Curated annotation (Swiss-Prot):
Pathway: Cofactor biosynthesis; riboflavin biosynthesis; 2-hydroxy-3-oxobutyl phosphate from D-ribulose 5-phosphate: step 1/1. The record marks 127, 165 as: Essential for catalytic activity. Its cofactor is Mg(2+); Mn(2+). InterPro entries: DHBP_synth_RibB-like_a/b_dom, DHBP_synthase_RibB, GTP_cyclohydro_II, RibA-like_sf. Mg(2+) 2 binds at residues 29, 144. It is an enzyme of class 4 (lyase). Binds 2 divalent metal cations per subunit. Magnesium or manganese. Catalyzes the conversion of D-ribulose 5-phosphate to formate and 3,4-dihydroxy-2-butanone 4-phosphate. This is 3,4-dihydroxy-2-butanone 4-phosphate synthase.
Length: 363
């Protein structure tokens, strides 16, 4: 796709203070955002975004910046489809009028991302919407929020960006054909989150591989691989049957969270129990069961056993998404046949993974 610029070119434009267009996967939001490093924002840049892109002007920031400003999350129960972490909206405490003009919004952003910014420098609510990026960036969550922080951080800039969705004249979201025309008209480069994931994956990993050894289970022998999460310090396991090959399908079960409740099989939201998944994969030529550890509090443990949970769809934890993908990529798994109900797994392209089908558990 010649209209897609390689990540080094995208990085160069970001470092030069230019805007770029960043797209996500077609099976995710399937949108393109204007994006620039926040420290270079100007009233003219904001005006261009609101005039030509027409979306919501947001301010992706890393967690430390959000905490330094004392910004609470917009809601304690995030029900957004893709888990975007909105904080409360903000305004510069001084130097603005209504807060909505391009100049006022630019000043608010400049104030918030200043290295000397303090909580008293901003007020809430306002006309700028900060977004808290996941630690680990696009290797953890394949979103525009994380891409914005990554692209700034990789250039040694302040870890914050300004983004705005691109909307067509008729109010619909701009897809790739329209984005290509937009880029050509305004002389902007287009980059993809998938390419950014692939670029970072070549030189970075969020996991430390602690080694592997055979392990006997009631369902037969597996090769146990142990990984330590560099961000959380938690330990994740992969139980591998056979030798996964890149050109053949591999049965995959990603079990998350893996906790004491699995030993008594008190997990009605998982269509495949851990024993059932291990038994099924042991009968296949190759397969992988990933056990992602995440500390659970008492409330979440009880919630697993409540009757109301039985009919609720299991919501994938975005913080674990990239971890599972990195484990699979490292095991040479490319084509996944997932043990579970059909669902959308976004952002896998950058890890070189493809879901070819699903297998639901028998009732």
């Amino acid at each position: 796709m010649s209209h897609i610029s390689p990540i080094p070119e995208i990085l160069a434009d970001i470092k030069a203070g230019k805007m770029v267009i960043i797209t996500d996967a077609e099976d995710r939001e399937n949108e393109g955002d204007l994006l620039m490093a926040a420290q270079f924002v100007t009233p003219e840049a904001i005006n261009f975004m609101i005039k030509h892109a027409r979306g919501l002007v947001c301010l992706p920031m890393d967690g430390e910046m959000v905490e330094k400003l004392g910004l609470p999350m917009m809601t304690q129960k995030n029900g957004a489809q893709y888990g975007t972490n909105f904080t409360v909206s903000i305004e510069a405490a001084h130097g603005i009028t209504t807060g909505i003009s391009a100049a006022d919004r630019a000043l608010t952003i400049q104030t918030a991302v200043s290295p000397t910014a303090k909580p008293e420098d901003i007020v809430q609510p306002g006309h700028i919407f900060p977004l808290r990026a996941q630690k680990g960036g696009v290797l953890v969550r394949a979103g525009h929020t994380e891409a914005g922080v990554d692209l700034a951080q990789m250039n040694g800039l302040i870890p914050a960006s300004v983004i705005c969705e691109i909307i067509n004249d008729d109010g619909t979201m701009a897809r790739m054909p329209e984005l290509m025309k937009f880029a050509e008209e305004h002389k902007l480069k287009i980059g993809t989150i998938a390419d950014l994931i692939e670029y970072r994956s070549r030189t970075e990993s969020l996991l430390e591989d602690m080694g592997n050894a055979p392990v006997q289970t009631p369902w037969g022998e597996f090769q146990q691989h142990v990984y330590v999460d560099k961000l959380s310090g938690e330990t994740h396991l992969a139980l591998v049957k056979g030798t996964p090959a890149a050109d053949t399908e591999t049965l995959v079960r990603v079990h998350e969270p893996f906790s004491v409740m699995d030993f008594i099989q008190a997990n009605p939201r998982h269509s495949w129990s851990l024993p059932k998944a291990l038994e099924h994969i042991q009968q296949a030529e190759s397969g992988v069961v990933i056990l992602l550890h995440r500390t659970e509090d008492g409330a979440s443990l009880l919630d697993r056993t409540l009757p109301k949970g039985a009919n609720q769809a299991y919501k994938w934890d975005s913080k674990s998404y990239g971890i599972g993908a990195q484990i699979l990529a490292g095991l040479n798994v490319k084509k996944l046949r997932v043990l579970g109900q059909p669902s959308s797994f976004t952002g896998l392209t950058g890890f070189g993974l493809e879901v070819v089908g699903f297998e639901e558990a028998e009732k």
